[in-house]
Amino acid sequence: MEQTKYRMELVLLLGLISMLSFIPASIAAEEGQEHDNLTTYIVHVKKLEIEGPLQSTEELHTWHHSFLPETSNKDRMVFSYRNVASGFAVRLTPEEANALQEKEEVMSIRPERTLSLHTTHTPSFLGLRQGQGLWNDSNLGKGVIIGVIDTGIYPFHLSFNDEGMPPPPAKWKGHCEFTGGSVCNNKLIGARNLVKSAIQEPPYEDFFHGTHTAAEAAGRFVEGASVFGNARGTAAGMAPDAHLAIYKVCSSKVKDECPESAILAAMDIAIEDGVDVLSLSLGLGSLPFFEDPIAIGAFAATQKGIFVSCSAANSGPHYSSLSNEAPWILTVGASTIDRKISASAKLGNGAEYEGETLFQPKDFSSQLLPLVYAAAEKNNSSALCAPGSLRNINVKGKVVVCDLGGGIPFIAKGQEVLDAGGSAMILANIENFGFTTLANAHVLPAVHVSYAASLAIKAYINSTYTPTATVLFQGTIIGDSLAPSVAAFSSRGPSQQSPGILKPDIIGPGVNILAAWAVSVDNKIPAFDIISGTSMSCPHLSGIAALLKSAHPDWSPAAIKSAIMTTANTLNLRGLPILDQRLQPADIFATGAGHVNPVRANDPGLVYDIQPEDYVPYLCGLGYSDREVTIIVQRSVRCFNVKSIAQAELNYPSFSILLGSDSQFYTRTLTNVGPANSTYTVKIDVPLAMGISVSPSQITFTQVNQKVAYFVDFIPQIKENRGNHTFAQGAITWVSDKHVVRTPISVIFK
């Protein structure tokens, strides 16, 4: 009964989503008119100086309530944080917030912000095969708990069945907030809703995002998965036998859809519950780490040995457009896979331009139809096929060219064409999107084509009085040799907050990804859909991290990150450098270390390890104040007493050098996780306009877990050698008879 009721609610919500209208619930409805000016604030306070930890949650709440105005009531407290921060979220008036700021114990107080979501075949594409390699060594992730912080989940999907799965590990402390005892199981072991609203509800999906990301990370094997008959095969996440814990932090039913206070609360509870991996496909943009809730929460998680994977954001191809930049986070960009859901635009002059679409109706005629680009007849709004823009334009029975952009969802553009009587749509890329095309479940026959194709199609329209076109459908095609390539939307580095740390760290599958969906888009059950974004690449890496954690339970979060980065692929299936959306070699700020190779990451040979305490000198070196560092690390820090280090001195599995006229000298320490007796020789790919000296040029290990340091001198050359280049890239690679350990280098010229 509960499942049927939820399906009905989701169908109604899907209709609302298609109209792009949400009706938010009022968080403060029950508090009365006198509290209309209350705002949620995030408050960081000094740790209570007592011997040992607080004895109970009640003691913590009592202490936090002591900061509140005497006239306020307990309903003002939104969350008390125990693990991720020394502080709480509370609803105050601006005057009360100003008064609280004056208290000596208060280190920081500011209004909370709203975070944004970063919205079958991939296991095979990544080399994961049943009974072999990493899937075999890790038992498909068995015993590892992945915490997914997202929009909730549709728990009844077959991707979350628990057939043959053991109970969760004894360390698991979480619980399930779904009503009915059979909703959670040995696969979906916990689910919480952290979004505070007038009516508290179970953590059901209402954004059509969290179900997909959870299934990508750890969905079970489901045969016969497809959407509109395309991408048919067996669906599976990266770690099919890992346990899932779901933390809902976003809801369409509240004003601030992904509130910061809920995200901190989810990370706080996940740490307490005992997760091994945290996956967050959301972000706030670039913020100082002491103001970034994910950076603060992730540091606390890292201290507990929890691996944190986050999406890089979808603001590419612009430089310095990243979210989630902290070095203790794995920052994941998006790449294509070798599967295309292919279609083409055929013009009256005989030319055909390849593209993609998910909706491929078999009854659509290949007969040529009149072709129109509405911008030539009206204005920019009609060129974008904005809602209502085609109302007074004759598009009935025609193929309509719609430009990408304008903040208008792809599906909404097609809906406008359909409502105006159009027969088909050609979705035309703008320059920034280049050759990146997406397969969407359009509402009418459509094809998404590249920027080069869009220019050619518009030139054809202008060349004749009677332009015609149609859309041809080719279905699923596997074997695109240009994969992986970097998606146009994938956010790029360098990091704004810490340019001395290379970001993103890695790229992974994030374009046209099939996974579980809450409501069927093609009237088939179980439901699947194909969507794109760094939101999709993040859970791929979260699942891969879970596999590595299962195969190597003694590895630290930093060691797992190092294994992923130093074994990454830098070539596509054709054996050429990975390309970007222009079909040009992608630079290091697009790819980071490269494209994830989970099979090689399982046996990296060497790793760069970092302990949580090592980040303190780095944070002081960023110029943060004692108070700001204390907010992040949750203990009193005086940078005067800490030997600060430059950003590039952190023992990171990459180098990011800000190079002026002086040489720079850095040390790295490698830990042997390969054969006890092994020798590595250095190979240097020297970046443009500089020299590199590495000493020693050969390193030998005689024990497992032995550590050996090496030293690197970065030597600038004359500025004229740089030409117009503002940065350069290269690599230091350690090679043995069994392993290749690549450390990428970015150089930003000052």
From Swiss-Prot:
Enzyme class: hydrolase
Glycosylation: residue positions: N37, N136, N380, N462, N677, N724
Residue positions of the active site: D150 (charge relay system), H209 (charge relay system), S535 (charge relay system)
Location of the protein in the cell: Secreted, Extracellular space, Apoplast
UniProt xrefs under InterPro entries: PA_domain (IPR003137), Peptidase_S8/S53_dom (IPR000209), Peptidase_S8/S53_dom_sf (IPR036852), Peptidase_S8_Asp-AS (IPR023827), Peptidase_S8_subtilisin-rel (IPR015500), Peptidases_S8_3 (IPR034197), S8pro/Inhibitor_I9 (IPR010259), S8pro/Inhibitor_I9_sf (IPR037045)
Effect of loss of the gene: Decreased fungal colonization and impaired arbuscular mycorrhiza (AM) development during AM symbiosis with AM fungi (e.g. Glomeromycota intraradices).
BP terms from Gene Ontology: arbuscular mycorrhizal association; proteolysis; response to symbiotic fungus
Limits of the PA domain: 370-456
Induction record: Rapidly induced in roots during development of arbuscular mycorrhiza (AM) upon colonization by AM fungus (e.g. Glomeromycota intraradices).
GO molecular function terms attached to this record: serine-type endopeptidase activity
EC number: 3.4.21.-
Domain Inhibitor I9, chain residue ranges per copy: 40-118
Segments forming domain Peptidase S8: 125-602
GO cellular component: apoplast; extracellular space
Signal peptide, first to last residue: 1-28
Keywords: Apoplast, Glycoprotein, Hydrolase, Protease, Secreted, Serine protease, Signal
Domain of life: Eukaryota
Function comment: Required for arbuscular mycorrhiza (AM) development during AM symbiosis with AM fungi (e.g. Glomeromycota intraradices).
Record family assignment: Belongs to the peptidase S8 family.
Protein name according to UniProt: Subtilisin-like protease 1
Organism (species): Lotus japonicus (Lotus corniculatus var. japonicus)
